[in-house]
């Protein structure tokens, strides 16, 4: 892939400070460029195949700026807890223009259904909690995420993209029946998409 003849720097920073034997504070930040975009109709709620395209050469690469901070705690009972808060800014995203089945007379002759995009910016923020037990006959983890994502396009203004799910709960459990036999289960529960 070489549509872009430009060098992009993606610096990243990760720090962890051990406040005590059981408590650690974390900070992560970074820049992330992406050279792919989806070319799917945003009005489709059920999609079996995601169509990905390279960013057109006349568009800059998508940029995400991440910052994540959190605290970790290992209890005397060997149960791990983690709480994180994050914020992400998105620039130069692309959203496929809808209702453009083909070029029409008078339009740009190079415009097709798969290269006509709205310039899109966005942001995302959320809180994540993890509880994890790694030892003993019964072990597993519970994770909960509260997240919000918003995109801005010229025709729609600020809106929630169709993949935005506010609440997600994951539960994984393992039980050792014998030293050689383990049973496991996993359950995921999430709120629905913003549009139905």
Walk through the language-model features, giving the residues of each.
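Face-selective signature of the C-terminal outer-membrane beta-barrel domain
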Residues: 1-5, 18, 79-82, 133-134, ...
């Amino acid at each position: 892939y070489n549509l872009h003849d430009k060098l992009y720097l993606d610096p990243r920073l990760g720090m962890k400070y051990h406040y005590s034997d059981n408590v650690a504070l974390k900070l992560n930040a970074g820049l992330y460029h992406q050279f792919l975009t989806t070319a799917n109709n945003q009005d489709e709620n059920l999609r079996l195949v995601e169509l990905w395209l390279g960013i057109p050469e006349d568009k800059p690469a998508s940029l995400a700026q991440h910052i994540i901070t959190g605290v970790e705690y290992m209890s005397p009972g060997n149960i791990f807890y983690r709480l994180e808060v994050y914020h992400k800014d998105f620039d130069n995203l692309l959203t496929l223009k809808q209702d453009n089945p083909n070029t029409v007379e008078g339009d740009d002759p190079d415009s097709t259904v798969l290269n006509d995009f709205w310039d899109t910016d966005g942001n995302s923020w959320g809180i994540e909690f993890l509880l994890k037990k790694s030892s003993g006959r019964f072990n597993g983890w519970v994770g909960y995420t509260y997240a919000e994502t918003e995109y801005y396009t010229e025709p729609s203004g600020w809106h929630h993209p169709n993949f935005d799910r506010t609440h997600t709960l994951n539960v994984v459990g393992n039980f050792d029946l014998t030293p050689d036999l383990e049973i496991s289960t996993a359950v995921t529960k999430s709120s629905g998409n913003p549009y139905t």
